[in-house]
Amino acid sequence: MPITLDEALVFTLKWEGGFTNNPLDPGGPTNFGIIQSRYDQYRKSKGLSRQSVQAITKAEYTEIYDVYYWEPVRAKWLDGTLGLALFDTAVNLGVGGCIRRLQASLNVPMTGTWTNAISDVIHESDQLEVAINICKLRIAKRYDRIKERPDQRVFLKGWLNRDNALLRKVKSMGGMSVMAFEEDDDLDFDVDEIYNSFEPELLHEIERLDNLQGEKNID
């Protein structure tokens, strides 16, 4: 059963709420998960003057999430498990990075854009299984990111906690049991084990394409 954007935002905004401007984050100034350049793009499309993303309103960020993330990954047409996984991944890794991981999970060419090849197979697939695989590909990306940029290790715990929360959420939505933990940052998985479950060539190609597009929350 599909979920709504508002339902998806309940999860995503737990991780994206508030203003940040960490010099190590290539996204720069960010508020409610919306980076300044995306906000500039949105306001320009409305014929509005530029202003700091700190001033973004709920109506604005909700519309941005709808137009730039929810609609491009077609989340409203999919089972809620996959819809949530795609939406949150689009917000976290960019739409192109999200769709590449969907394409890798469906074993279709990785263009980074929605294609007929996706449409041809997605409704015949086990969408819960695809959602779980996308979560695992996110986790694997963290491994490559830290190898490429050791200074990004400061974000690793937060990334993995978010990935873990998403993995648990989609499993729960799909009727799978999840363990209760005493600590919020306990993980359900071993990062090395997940990383090594994928063919190295696949992970390297996804990362190469991510870097080629040079995206961080904006396409």
Residue ranges of each PLM-predicted region?
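Cell-wall polysaccharide-cleaving catalytic domain and substrate-binding groove, primarily
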Residues: 1-219
